[in-house]
Swiss-Prot record:
GO terms for cellular component: cytosol; small ribosomal subunit. Coiled coil: none annotated. Keywords: ATP-binding, DNA-binding, Isomerase, Nucleotide-binding, Topoisomerase. It comes from the Archaea. Homodimer. Heterotetramer of two Top6A and two Top6B chains. Its EC number is 5.6.2.2. The keyword Glycoprotein does not apply. It comes from Methanocaldococcus jannaschii (strain ATCC 43067 / DSM 2661 / JAL-1 / JCM 10045 / NBRC 100440) (Methanococcus jannaschii). The lineage of its organism: Archaea, Methanobacteriati, Methanobacteriota, Methanomada group, Methanococci. Belongs to the TOP6B family. Relaxes both positive and negative superturns and exhibits a strong decatenase activity. Pfam families: HATPase_c, Topo-VIb_trans. This is Type 2 DNA topoisomerase 6 subunit B. ATP binds at residues 48, 80, 101-102, 111-118, 581. Signal peptide: none annotated.
Amino acid sequence: MVGFMGDELFKEFKEHSVAEFFRKNKHMLGYSGKIRSLTTIIHELVTNSLDACEEAGILPDIKVEIEKLGADHYKVAVEDNGPGIPLEFIPKVFGKMLAGSKMHRFIQSRGQQGIGAAGVLLFSQITTGKPLKIITSTGDGNIYEVEVKMNVEKNEGEIVSKKVRKGKWRGTRVEGEFKEVSYNRGEFGPFEYLRRISLATPHAKIVLKDPYGEVVFDRVVNELPKKPEEMKPHPYGLTTDELLYIARKTKSKKVSSMLVSELSRVTTKRIKELINYMLRDLILKKFKDSVFWNMVVSCYLNIDIESYLNKFKDYITDDEIETVRMLIKNLPESLDELKRYALKYITMEYLFNKLSEEEINKLKNHFKKIPENFMEWAEKNYLSATVVDELNKKVKNIVKNPEEFIAEIKNKGLISDEELKKFEDEVKSILNKNPKELTWDEAEMIVNCLQSMEFMAPPTTGLRPIGAENIEKSLKELLQPDFVKAITRNPKTYKGGIPFAVEVAIAYGGNAGRQGDEGRRMEIMRFANHVPLLYDASACGLTKAVKSINWKRYGLRGEDAPITVFVNLISTFIPYTSAGKQAVACSENENEEIYNEIRHALMICGRELEKYLSRIRREAEEEKKRKYVMKYARIFAEALANILNKPVDEIEEKVVKLLE
């Protein structure tokens, strides 16, 4: 009966394509809400156009057309002057999920997954049933007009119609109809998105034609930014799974050459160093649960305990000192008992660093006796977890330097030359094997050893900032502020080896800030790799970093000020909070390197703003005083004229000049 039920259940078992998954979960692609869905469409098509133009070395000219066809029904067209798309790639670009030119590259880019354009087609198809119309040419004299639909079950694009005509034009135009969308020029729609992306791409010209008219976001820089270089993964950001993935894809014939060619900061010299680390870990792995491991620990433990005996001699008895020294002489047989004393001294050291002299004296008698169960004693003092951590740290320090560790255990006769040679051969065999034969345990050991070594931070050639000067030009063009200050911080790393950089700017006065019921208030513009983040502001670490600043210190009334704060995070990997990619995960406790960089940059800009506001207030105060004095200049001149017996007008003229 049970077997029959199992057969029945699995009759409904089916495989599903990634396109089918997103058809049922379109909100994960940003298609949730009428305005947000239309903004997502514009975002995907515009960023694709920008990326194509920049990769081809072309200054982007982008046209966006939004036409209302009916209630919640719009036609959208995005046209660029980019390199065009070869005919054979059109079905893959627009009709296949997870197909693209970015996901496999370790480089800063606006998008990576290869979902965006295909997601636009999928949304058009499930809301109107209509294909996307693609007009494109690579400049070879042939202009293709193609209609593409998606076979959702197969996750493949299909050309349903094709026309070819001759003409001199190069670029791509995408047209589509969409329902369940809405448009306005509010702060969370396509207009605001284009307004902000024009700030982050000052070298692009974007023309928007919508139901309200035409708006031109002109370029303010006539030079393309330098292309970011593709980077290699850094050892500190490497995982076992990633190393095995690299091993499957590499063209290298040996693991050692793969590490040099595929990873950043790994050289042939560092491979020799890696051999010692792997040798250390292999020895420890083989003997960690044996008497050998206890003997290894004892080599170092006796030195530590001697230092503790001298340090805490006022808190332990002479008999205890003698007992400990006898135990050391009788190693390794007495190691288990000696460990109990070692744990006591580690705990004492921890307490001495934490407690006051008075509290230590109260515990003095407690120190002078060894309880039956020392861990129980520590637990009563709420220190068991900390004590174990301290002990683990000491064990790690014991084997921190692999060369010293190997030399020490060899000198003490804990390992023979034959045994050591056997381990060395095993390490060399791992590094000399074909990468495709690498096992999980071997890859895990390599990753752990690499992350125990010291490496320079990864190169930052894969990052491409907008540049402080360009940000200031864009903000001046868009907001006409009274004051603007931008800064691009030097690149740093987070999570051990992922490079990132932060750019921030403050614009004050003019059209800065957002209009509220009681005047202009602070406006926060968030960007990730130059792409505007319009939604989920309260959940975003960039917002939290801005709000953590005490703006009153810089002469503002908190957030009730006409100020626009610009924050752009650039990285080869942006730590988004979710698949929607609208909020960045960073705070005081998570990816704090990013959070702190934003704060530091904002404080630098804030100090410049404070100087500006102080000068303005000082000038205003001086002007007020001058006007006050000028008010009485005539009276003063009349009195002085009587004394000097000179014309009043002549005296007044000189007084005014003096005041000016």
